[in-house]
Amino acid sequence: MKQLLEFIPLILFFTVYKLSGIRDAAITLVIATIVQMLILRVKYGKIEKQQVIMGVAVVFFGLLTAYFNEVKYLQWKVTIVYALFAAILLIGQFVFKTPLIRKLLGKEIELPDTAWQKLNLGWAGFFVLCMLVNIYISQYYSEDIWVDFKSFGIIGMTLLATLITGVYIYRYLPKDKD
């Protein structure tokens, strides 16, 4: 249920964009994101920091996009959020000597410190890649192509990164000796 709830604003954004354009899609995205945050707060008692960052960014840049009827603000949001996530992971690892990805997954999974560090760097690299691909597509392709990329391309990239992470973690899981 929680994962499905996270996709609803994006699905609504894509649908309204195709029917009515960027201004209405941005307004729909802002409203759906606020409703999503309220549901998460009521149903689960809290909202994760990552979701708060995304929610604030969606509302801020979505309102700018709606007000100016200009997609570039939502395009900036994607770039800025991914840059922020990469910076947080890199600062955690190199300044505070803590791979922050461990805080997300470390309760369920035990890995050696070097594995956490590589995983942390991998996700930081993934966020930088998403940021760069977003910049490229937003600058060199049409608004329609960018909306398709934002709606489906980033999801595909994230699923692939998650699959690679799972394969990487699997190498460190205890092996049964039957």
UniProtKB/Swiss-Prot annotation:
It comes from the Bacteria. The keyword Transmembrane helix applies. It is a multi-pass membrane protein. InterPro entries: YciB (IPR006008). Keywords: Cell inner membrane, Cell membrane, Membrane, Transmembrane, Transmembrane helix. It is found in: Cell inner membrane. One of its GO terms (cellular component) is plasma membrane. The keyword Transmembrane applies. HAMAP family: YciB. Belongs to the YciB family. Plays a role in cell envelope biogenesis, maintenance of cell envelope integrity and membrane homeostasis. This is Inner membrane-spanning protein YciB.
